[in-house]
Structure formats: C-alpha cells, structure tokens
Swiss-Prot record:
Pfam families: YgaP-like_TM (PF11127). Keywords: Cell membrane, Membrane, Transmembrane, Transmembrane helix. It comes from the Bacteria. Disulfide bonds: none annotated. It is a multi-pass membrane protein. GO terms for cellular component: plasma membrane. This is Uncharacterized membrane protein YezF. InterPro entries: YgaP-like_TM.
Length: 75
C-alpha cells in the first residue's frame, strides 16, 4: 500500500478528522443516547486514519477506474 495523497492533503485530513472526532466526542458525552454522534466519531477517525497512512481508498478507486477506461478507449 503506497501513499496516494500528498503530504499537505494528509495534514489537512488529520486536522479535520481530529476536529470532527473531538467535536462529536464532546456532543456524545452530553447525549450518549444519540447514535449519530457515534457515527461522526467513526467518520472523523476514518478521515484521520487516511491522513496518517497517506492512503485514501476512494482516491485509489478513482485512479484505477480512470486507467481502466483509458485502456478501453485506446484498445
């Protein structure tokens, strides 16, 4: 698994992911019965994790789907 996002993009993802996680955690402590805050915590963790690993599965999928379409058009 090699990195497919830039360093600046990774730093931005880490910052946004940790911000989302901390805001959702604060809301979740006030309303633990609301499951939407738990969903936001997981989404923030996923965003921060993709920044730490510098690998985004969605970017990978789009890069490989574009290369497959070019082969069909050329061949």
């Amino acid at each position: 698994m090699k990195p497919n996002i830039s360093l600046i993009n990774a730093v931005f993802r880490i910052a946004c992911g940790l911000t989302i996680m901390s805001a959702a955690s604060a809301k979740f402590t006030k309303k633990p019965w609301c499951r939407m805050h738990l969903f936001y915590i997981f989404m923030g963790a996923m965003k921060a994790g993709s920044g730490i690993l510098r690998f985004c599965p969605v970017t990978y999928m789009f890069q490989h789907s574009d290369s497959g379409n070019n082969e069909h058009q050329n061949g």
